[in-house]
Amino acid sequence: MLYEVKEISGGFSLITAQTDKFKSESLNIHFLIPLSKAPYSEVLLPNVMTQGCAKYPTRRLLRKRLDYLFSSSVSAYLPTFGDHMSLCFSSSFLKNAFAYDSCDIAGGTAELLFDLMLDPLISNGAFSDEYTEREKKNKCDALRAAINNKDSYASNRCLRLMCEGEPVSFLYSTDTEPYEMITPSSLYDSYLDIMAHAPIIMTYVGENICFAEELAYKLSERLKNEHRNVYKSTVTYKAPKEIRYFEEKHNIKQARLVIGFRDKPSTPDDIYIKTVFDELYGQSPVSKLFTNVREKLSLCYYCSSGRNHETGNMIVRTGIKAENKDLAYNEILHQLDLVKQGDFTDGELENAKRGFANQVLSVLDSPDSIASFIFKGMMRGCILSPNEEAEKIMRVTKEQVADAARGVKPDTVFFMYGDETEDENED
């Protein structure tokens, strides 16, 4: 598989992965938006814009066109990366070689994607009132209902408290008021600003690289902006001064303990080491946390860790009996101390490396996963093949993992508890 990065214009890059392995191909167009601008309007754009466009104003007409294109798919969504999120227009389609009637599937799907992206359904300089109000309601309803999922609520609450005042805290906000203030015209203004200024990364996974390059230049011409903003991460490491503790009482039986940690953002040189540490410490079924805190000591119902490599933030989340809070907390930190000291076996290290390497190699199973992989590589400033990454993973040493562990510092503790005699009202 051949990877190539090509600058189409200022702030607009094309990344291609040439392969003939699959029957389908993938085309994605990312518009990068800094979280520092609190992009509430932008959050509504994917669902509003995929309801219809000027040429196909209803979902039924869109579906009919996609059916004609051999069940191609087009969508829009909002992946996040560090202190940025991406308004991504995505498509997947069958290769033209498999069309029995000489249909230009690739060209037709790309044209439909451009229709959704560049010619949205607009009336009097604004998006549809109906679609905008519907998506505002859906978003506000989802935010109000977030508390019903106690596991994700506790994790997000800890991260919001830990990252208060930082751009990334936007991702964990449950405030509905900014969404209620959005109008169809203000939403359209946000769309126009993105199209005019946002950095663009286009990814293509397939056989016809010339096709992708033609599309990229066509898009550049349609947008008519040779000098877009340039992506630059503003994430900085904020060393914890002291551990902060927060508690909330809810109508639950099973308490939740979430510990937020800080580390420096990962770099292309150490991301593999840190992920091996994550696998070893708390991110796999054979991790230190699962094996000891849950299985051996029975201090929790579940216990796992998760890291955002771009911000350096990491959390350990557990479901526990309230009376086990201190025991679980101390054991979680004790297991971290053991890893810092290199107190783990060669077998544990090998399992962690192989588990992570297998995850990376599974990227090669589909065009969409490859597209996501090369996009992340581009954002990090280093695109390697999955095989090259797997080789780097397998070379990680015990001392490197211990050193990575020593960079992880506890910052914020969030404890959610209730009256364990009450009926639990949670999903």
Where does each model-flagged region fall?
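Short, low-order "capping/linker" segments at domain edges
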Residues: C140-I147, E242-R256, A357-D368
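His/Glu-rich zincin catalytic helix
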Residues: M1-L69, D175, M181, Y188-N292, ...
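Compact, aliphatic and Gly/Pro-tolerant "microcore" segments centered on a short helix or tight beta-hairpin
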Residues: D129-D193
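Short, polar/flexible loop-turn hinges at active-site or ligand-entry regions and domain interfaces
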Residues: G52-K55, N96-Y100, D119-S128
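Short, flexible, solvent-exposed loop/turn segments with mixed acidic/basic and small polar residues
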Residues: L78-F81, L187-A196, S304-N308, A402-R406
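Flexible helix-coil linker/hinge segments at domain or subdomain boundaries
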Residues: D119-S123, R228-Y231, F344-G347
